């Protein structure tokens, strides 16, 4: 009788059990964003007041079995707003106070191959090879939702579009990653739709020092020193350059921390800090840079509010001067669903000796499949 009762109780579980995954299969997500911002005031002449653009980021994986897959990331973005080809500032992701702004950047969109890699993963480690973004820092991640502008400011020190390989040790509550790479100067560094051209292999920027002669090491995790909800990240990178006078290896370090303090079931506070020090930024000897991000994020139910300060200082060895930039931002956001959010920000920005006040909004939708 007991056996019959056990079979009866287990039968619905068997009937509705999830069918085993069939391989190969395709999985991933697509981040779609629409951003609009307006320069309220500025000391710089010739700045167009309005700007709007669409950003789309598909992450697609072709899974051969439970361990092996090919992973890709694509970016559809406007070349005149978001770029990595600023000759004066090779690390610059976005110049906020610029004349090339439009109410909607139609016709400026480029489709970039951000990542294209072979990936192996089991319970203990992850190995990948191909084109990828090495890990260094976290303040540039859009998922942080530190307002509209902070992630674009901090993209300056994000490592992007490299060719090489990496391995990650998947530990309990943390992971350690080692990458070895060089800049992508192949045809994959070009773009579809609006062409940006192939990246130069002879422009002497950091990362163009030869095959796999650059590397990075990072550690990211949670529950630091056993304290629940204390998240952290550490990173080191060393980028090679050619043996040319006035050029030296870029060496950088990052340390970041954030703590999730739960006030109640629906309310939490998150203090966040990330500090970055970069020597020979871009490969130029003596061009040293420092970035600091501090934020306080409050969450109540579906609402998010934050105040943040981002500062950068870059030494200019040729003129024995410093270029300082900063961003003070206040933001409020709302999450309609787990995948659909809106953020509105007011920011005071200092950039290249000029200052300005901006207001911006971003609509974000994440489609998973």
Predicted regions and their residues:
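Outer-membrane pore/translocation modules
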Residues: 108, 134-164, 168-259
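Residues that define the transmembrane beta-barrel architecture of outer-membrane proteins
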Residues: 47-56, 109-114, 121, 159-165, ...
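Outer-membrane beta-barrel channels and translocator barrels
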Residues: 23, 61-69, 122-125, 171-174, ...
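Outer membrane beta-barrel
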Residues: 53-186
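Outer-membrane beta-barrel "beta-signal"
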Residues: 334, 355-369
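Transmembrane beta-strands of outer-membrane beta-barrel pores
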Residues: 34-42, 74-80, 122-124, 131-135, ...
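Transmembrane beta-strands of outer-membrane beta-barrel proteins
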Residues: 22-36, 68-74, 127, 174-178, ...
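Detector for outer-membrane/organellar transmembrane beta-barrel domains
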Residues: 176-177, 212-322
């Amino acid at each position: 009788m007991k056996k019959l009762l056990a079979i009866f109780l287990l039968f619905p579980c068997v009937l509705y059990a999830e069918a085993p995954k069939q391989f190969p299969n395709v999985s991933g997500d697509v981040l779609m964003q629409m951003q609009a911002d307006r320069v309220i005031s500025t000391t710089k002449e010739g700045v167009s007041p309005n700007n709007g653009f669409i950003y789309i980021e598909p992450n697609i994986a072709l899974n051969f079995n439970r361990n092996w897959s090919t992973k890709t990331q694509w970016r559809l973005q406007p070349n005149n707003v978001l770029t990595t080809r600023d000759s004066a500032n090779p690390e610059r992701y976005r110049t906020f106070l610029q004349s090339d702004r439009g109410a909607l950047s139609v016709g400026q969109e480029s489709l970039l191959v951000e990542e294209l890699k072979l990936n192996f993963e089991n319970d203990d480690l992850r190995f990948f090879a191909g084109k990828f973004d090495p890990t260094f820092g976290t303040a540039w991640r859009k998922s942080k939702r530190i307002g509209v502008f902070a992630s674009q400011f901090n993209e300056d020190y994000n490592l992007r579009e490299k060719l090489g390989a990496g391995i990650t040790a998947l530990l309990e509550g943390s992971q350690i990653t080692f990458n070895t790479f060089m800049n992508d100067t192949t045809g994959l560094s070009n773009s579809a739709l609006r062409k940006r051209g192939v990246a130069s292999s002879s422009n002497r920027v950091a990362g163009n020092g030869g095959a796999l002669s650059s590397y990075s090491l990072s550690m990211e995790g949670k529950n630091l020193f056993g304290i629940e909800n204390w998240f952290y990240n550490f990173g080191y990178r060393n980028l090679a350059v050619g043996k040319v006078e006035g050029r030296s290896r870029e060496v950088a370090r990052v340390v970041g921390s954030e703590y999730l303090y739960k006030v109640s079931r629906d309310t939490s506070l998150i203090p966040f800090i990330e500090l970055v020090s970069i020597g020979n930024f871009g490969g130029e000897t003596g061009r040293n840079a420092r970035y600091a991000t501090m934020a306080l994020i409050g969450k109540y139910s579906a609402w998010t509010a934050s105040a943040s300060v981002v500062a950068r200082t870059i030494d200019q060895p040729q003129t024995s001067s410093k270029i300082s930039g900063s961003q003070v931002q206040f933001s409020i956001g709302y999450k309609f669903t787990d995948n659909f959010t809106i953020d509105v920000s007011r920011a005071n920005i200092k950039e290249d000796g000029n200052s300005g006040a901006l207001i911006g909004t971003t609509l974000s939708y994440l489609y998973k499949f």
